[in-house]
Each structure stands twice: as structure tokens, then as C-alpha cells.
Amino acid sequence: MTLSVYWPRDEYPEAVEVLQRRLSSDVQLHWGSAPPDRCDVLIAGRPDRDQLTASPDLQALVIPFAGVPMSTRATLADFPDLRVHNLHHNAASTAEMAVALLLATAKRLLPFDRALRADDWRPRYEDFTASMLLDGKRALVLGYGAIGQRIARVLNALGLRVTAVCRHPERHPDAADAGVDLRSTRELDDLWAQADALLIALPQTPATEGLVGASELQRMPDHAVLVNVGRGPVVDQAALYEALCDGKLGGAGIDVWYNYPSDPEERANTPPAAYPFGELANVVMSPHRAGGGDAVEARRMAELAELLNALARGQTEAQRVDLSAGY
């Protein structure tokens, strides 16, 4: 039987055409504003109730990016029999951004760049020890999914001693072979003091929101660096701002935030947080762009096609989301 798939998007027809070419003959893709009469699979990141109830044949929702938005989780609570799947096409680009933010923060690239653009060499002589040597330092990676695993491998190659945390370490028996000391989230309280570099690759769920607060930051070594490519609210923004201001943290590289523009008109003047992180010289700011890149959309289409083809073959567990966990 043909799998009927509906993607209610009108933009980027070239990408949809790429997807169409990769689909097997038993997948029928409908896209645009007009839904088909029958729909087995809906592709939408933030579906509304009308979309979820339009077809009595709907079996699955595919979220075409990593993670599950909190608003979508709330909506799906009323659809307990609906399977949910998502994609991890952006794992490489997000991990690369995490490492870039770590290096830029640890090496204080931006303040020195700004000074030399003004022909000012003084910081080189006045602050010669400003850079953190990462080789031999201890890194703590929160989250050991597709992104966290890539981050851990690169950190290991840079000479850091890597500890990572996840809910089910038993599912990753090869972590030790990759040079990663993988621990359970139950052990996290004992690990903050070992985090010269803290890298966050966690989704936002009720269990992770506010996970890194004032107490956790105070237990980290003095002048540690923090990188967040997961979700902003995993870190308490007030505690983070204070730790950066008083020097407890040496710096932070942040790609994910607390406040986003709600429409195109707001994109030129929306503060990303309730605190002025942009005034701090020890912060590297990125506007939630870790998942982007020149080849990422092509990878999205390739992975989406692979998932839809798997669903058409009856592989209903492919990239399935556990909504009780939030990922």
C-alpha cells in the first residue's frame, strides 16, 4: 500500500523536488497549502490541531529537524496514539559550531580581533596568558546523542579528557573505546567540579529546563568555559550572566537563547535574553545558526527521504521520539 505523506510548506520547492527524487515508489508526497484526501504521515515541526485531525488515517508525525518544540509536545499530549519521528541531519554542523564556540571562547579570539582591527597590539602584551590551553583539560558533555557523540570525539582528539552524561549509558557500550567516560545523569552532581569546559547538547524538556543553575556553575572550576548548542533554557540565564560578570566563568559561547523574534519585523531589534550578554567581552554570541550550513538542507532531504522510505517498509521505530523523555 502506498504511504501518503503531506508536507504543508510552500517555500523551497527545489528542496522538495530533491526529496521527491529520493523517495521510493511506494511513497506519495503531497506538499503545499492544500492537504490530500488521505494522509498517513504529516511533516510539520509545529502542527496545529486542524492538521493533526484533518485525516483519520494519520499514523505518524515527522518533525523535520532535531528536537521537539515544547509547544508541539503540549499539543501532542492529546494525540497519544500518534507516532512521532524526527531528524538528526544537522548533527555534524551543530557539533562543528560547538567546537568553534569553544575555541573562540577559550582563546578569546573576538576581543583580540577587535583590538587588532583598530591597529591595537596592546592586548597581546598586557594579557599574554589570556588563552586557555585545552590540551589536558577536563570536558563535560551534557547529552550523548548524535551531536554530543561528535563533540566528544573532537574534544578527545584535541587532547581533552572527556566525560559525557546521558540517561542510558548502557546503550553506548563503545563509548570507552572512543575515549569517553560515559556516565548516567544520576551521577551528574559529582561531575560539575571536573568541568573545565562544559558543553551542552541537550534538548529542552521538563527534566532539562534550568538544569544548569547558580549552584552548578559555582561548583565548576574557576574560569571554566561554557558552550551551549542545545537549548537556551537548559541554563538559567540569570545565573549564567552573574557567573560571567563576576569572573567565576572564564567565558561562554552561546548559540541558543531565551527570546526570539516572533515575526520578520522584529529580527533587527530583538534582545536574545533578559540580560545584556552582548556587553560582556567574555561571551561569543551566535544567533541559533549551528544547524545551518551550505550542505545541511541537502542532508535534511536525504535523511527525510530515508526515514519516509523506512516508514513505507513498515519500520515504525525508525528515528522515533520518546515523548515522555522529550527526544
Locate predicted features.
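Phosphate/diphosphate ligand-binding glycine-rich loop within oxidoreductases
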Residues: 40-117, 131
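Rossmann-fold NAD(P) dinucleotide-binding segment
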Residues: 48-57, 73-75, 207-226
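N-terminal glycine-/charge-rich "phosphate-binding" loop or analogous flexible N-terminal tail
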Residues: 1-41, 161
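Alpha-helix C-terminal capping/helix-to-coil transition sites in glycosyltransferase folds
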Residues: 37-38, 57, 193-194, 219-222, ...
